[in-house]
């Protein structure tokens, strides 16, 4: 008689179902904030960052990396995050600061401003990516954190929504580049606007793609988005 196979005692791999609060729980009993930025890649406009402290008992459903969500889903989640979060804040670094510091340090500055603006001080921050920014509290970096941590996912949504609104406003102030549609990223209308109008006050003039577009050396269908990615 064949014996039935024994049940495996090996731990089962985690089944991915989207972001959860496991990373937050692993940080211990203190306040944990998620931190993420938006706008490292575009050729124009500020870089934004958000810091969010979530109540584990009131986590909005549907949180995910902001880039994976529709504009409608992000707008709904932004409202809910702001309603239920223990604390949240969005920080910005200007085009002048980006040009002076470089985009990576400007993103870190925006993160500092977001954390400093929280109504309560976090004990630790979960930061998307692998770069160890100098922030106002201890940090833990999380690669692809906006797909793993609800707090980071919430921060990614707030940062993107805040920056997108700014770029819509910039489109009205600086028409002809299509900022409202592409939010400062590479697009045919953006390249053509640079060729026809020259740079606006919010363009990142030190960036190679902007220089190439202004010199007429970047095709409108080129796949080059930025110098750094992100």
Curated annotation (Swiss-Prot):
Domain RNase H type-2 per the UniProt entry, residue ranges: 30-219
GO molecular function, one term: manganese ion binding
Source organism, top-level taxon: Bacteria
Keywords recorded for this protein, A-Z: Cytoplasm, Endonuclease, Hydrolase, Manganese, Metal-binding, Nuclease
Claim: Cytoplasm is one of the keywords in the record: yes
Binding-site positions, a divalent metal cation: 36-37, 128
Segments traversing the membrane: none
Cofactor detail note: Manganese or magnesium. Binds 1 divalent metal ion per monomer in the absence of substrate. May bind a second metal ion after substrate binding.
GO BP: DNA replication, removal of RNA primer; mismatch repair
Catalysis: reaction(s): Endonucleolytic cleavage to 5'-phosphomonoester
Chief localisation class: cytoplasm
Subcellular compartments: Cytoplasm
UniProt keyword Nuclease present: yes
InterPro entries the record matches: RNase_HII, RNase_HII/HIII, RNase_HII/HIII_dom, RNaseH-like_sf, RNaseH_sf
A cellular component term, taken from the record's GO annotations: cytoplasm
Needed co-factor(s): Mn(2+); Mg(2+)
EC number(s) recorded for this UniProt protein: 3.1.26.4
Function: Endonuclease that specifically degrades the RNA of RNA-DNA hybrids.
Similarity comment: family membership: Belongs to the RNase HII family.
Name of the protein this chain belongs to: Ribonuclease HII
Native organism: Caulobacter sp. (strain K31)
């Amino acid at each position: 008689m064949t014996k039935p196979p024994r049940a495996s005692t090996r731990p089962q791999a985690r089944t991915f179902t989207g972001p959860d609060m496991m990373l937050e729980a692993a940080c211990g009993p203190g306040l944990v904030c998620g931190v993420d930025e938006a706008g490292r890649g575009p050729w124009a406009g500020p870089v934004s960052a958000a810091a969010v402290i979530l109540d584990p008992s009131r986590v909005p459903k549907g949180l995910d990396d902001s880039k994976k969500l529709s504009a409608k889903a992000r707008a709904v989640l932004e409202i809910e995050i702001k309603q239920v979060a223990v604390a949240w804040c969005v920080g910005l670094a200007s085009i002048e600061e980006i040009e002076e510091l470089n985009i990576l340090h400007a993103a870190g500055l925006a993160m500092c401003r977001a954390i400093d603006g929280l109504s309560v001080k976090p004990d630790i921050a979960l930061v998307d990516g692998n770069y160890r920014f100098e922030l106002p509290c201890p940090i833990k970096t999380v690669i692809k954190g906006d797909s793993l941590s609800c707090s980071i996912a919430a921060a990614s949504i707030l940062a993107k929504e805040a920056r997108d609104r700014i770029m819509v406003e910039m489109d009205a102030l600086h028409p002809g580049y299509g900022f409202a549609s592409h939010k400062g990223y590479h697009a045919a209308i953006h390249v053509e606007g640079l060729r026809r109008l020259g740079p606006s006050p919010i363009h990142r003039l030190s960036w190679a793609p902007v220089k190439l577009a202004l010199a007429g050396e970047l095709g409108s269908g080129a796949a080059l988005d930025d110098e750094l990615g992100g």
